[in-house]
A protein has these predicted regions:
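Beta-propeller blade signature
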Residues: 142-153
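Beta-rich catalytic cores
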Residues: 20, 63, 75, 114, ...
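Conserved beta-propeller blade signature
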Residues: 32-34, 78-80, 125-127
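Asp-box/WD-like beta-propeller blade repeats and closely related beta-sheet repeat scaffolds
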Residues: 93-137, 141-143, 159
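Blade-loop segments of beta-propeller domains
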Residues: 50-87, 98-114
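Beta-propeller domains
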Residues: 28-60, 84-93
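Beta-strand-rich domains and repeat architectures in extracellular enzymes and scaffolds
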Residues: 10-42, 63-67
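Residue-level detector of Asp-centered blade-edge/turn motifs that repeat once per structural unit
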Residues: 26-30, 70-76, 120-123
Length: 166
């Protein structure tokens, strides 16, 4: 049995002072890590082969709580994001995002809530939890939490990525 490696960490790998860093996702094909800063409305990406100096940050005009790959699409080009009011397709090259599906049909809920966290299930469905936004204060047990699911009907195909038909 091989010995256990240990490291002494004396400083942060990335010292970027997130307001609320969440949603880490490892992109195996490019050896990169992406994660969001919900409060500061940012998506951070770092190439683990190159180190902290490769950090790229994309600034949004809304909080983003989660990201997901799109089946059959290069994640360095496009991914899904759970944003303030719905699911968006993010064009990472153009740094533009387009609303794919709103979470709610009412303006009141759209204003009060934001995406929080989510994941792709084995059937390729993108599940996203929503909760009251930061400007409302601490989360309250007020019946404002919900879970949304987005999926495309692709027969019996199973994938850990969201199927997007464009």
């Amino acid at each position: 049995m091989a010995g256990v490696k240990t490291w002494t960490v004396t400083e942060p790998y990335l010292n970027i002072h997130c307001g609320l860093g969440e949603g880490p996702y490892y992109e195996r094909d490019t050896n990169t890590l992406r994660f969001v800063d919900i409060k500061k409305k940012r998506l951070h990406t770092v190439d683990l082969s190159k180190g902290p100096e490769s950090l790229k940050t994309l600034q949004f005009d809304m909080p983003v709580g989660v990201t997901a790959d799109i089946e059959g699409v290069d994640p360095s080009k496009k991914i899904l994001i759970g944003g303030k009011s719905g699911i968006y397709v993010l064009d990472r090259v153009a740094e533009k995002w387009v609303l794919l599906k709103k979470f709610y049909d009412t303006e009141e809920k759209d204003e009060r809530l934001r995406s929080n966290d989510g994941a792709i299930d084995p059937q390729g469905r993108f599940w996203i939890g929503t909760m009251n936004d930061f400007w409302l204060g601490d989360p309250q047990a007020e019946g404002k939490w919900s879970l949304s699911c987005a999926a495309e009907n692709r027969g019996d195909t199973i994938s850990r990525r969201f199927y997007l038909c464009l």
